[in-house]
Amino acid sequence: LALTLFAGGILIGQLLGIPMWESVLGLVVISGLFAMAGGLKAIASTNVFQMALLILVSALLVVVGLHKAGGFSALYEATPGSFWNLFQPNDSPDYPWLAILLGYPIMGVWFWCTDQSMVQSVLGAKDLKTGQRGANFCGLLKILDVPLFILPGIICLVLFPEIKATPDKAYIHLVTNLFPSGLIGLVVVTMLAAMISTIGSALNSLSTVFTMDIYVRKYKPAACNKDVVRIGR
């Protein structure tokens, strides 16, 4: 949750020109109200909406960025070879291959298989087969990470070398410099939907853990469904 708030604060703050603490506070308040009012069903619906928008916007950004950079061949030639190699030397200060090899599987299994905000999405499916299809579809979508979310950072470095000092702002820097005002507005909506959905999922999972593992188990085992929903909200 903290990492999501940090990333969201950077994105929204850079787009709207407001301090990070205001961005974070706004995201928490809006996400909390959204989770309270709609619950998991509303969060799932927002996930589908923001997924489609995010893929569309990112694909368009890659196409426009590659065109500005002179095509993929020109982009490849303009960047160091290490940018296209996932496994860096073990003495790399950023991503040594040993850390990737040992760390990513652990983090991946933790997030995708045990994190409550992810598990609740699968457990909320109407049946086992639907849950399995959703999990497999989510895995297929991860393949899009490389072309849609890594390439924009490399494109930004080629077009705007000064961004190397603040790499966290590369995506939004590319958006604000390549897209017209109307598309920037669409990106703002997409980012807000993605942040609210992610934060709402985390808040909903925290609410579930507190309600079921603390309130029901420790204080009121005989609580009716109405009480459980009220405490969760």
Name the predicted role of every residue range.
Residues 3-6, 12-42, 229-233:
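Transmembrane alpha-helical segments of multi-pass small-molecule transport proteins
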Residues 211-233:
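Loop-to-transmembrane helix boundary motifs in multi-pass membrane proteins
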Residues 52-185:
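Loop-to-helix junctions at membrane interfaces in multi-pass transport proteins
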Residues 1-10, 184-216:
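Membrane-helix boundary/coupling elements in multi-pass transport proteins
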Residues 21-26, 52, 97-101, 183-187, ...:
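Hydrophobic alpha-helical transmembrane segments
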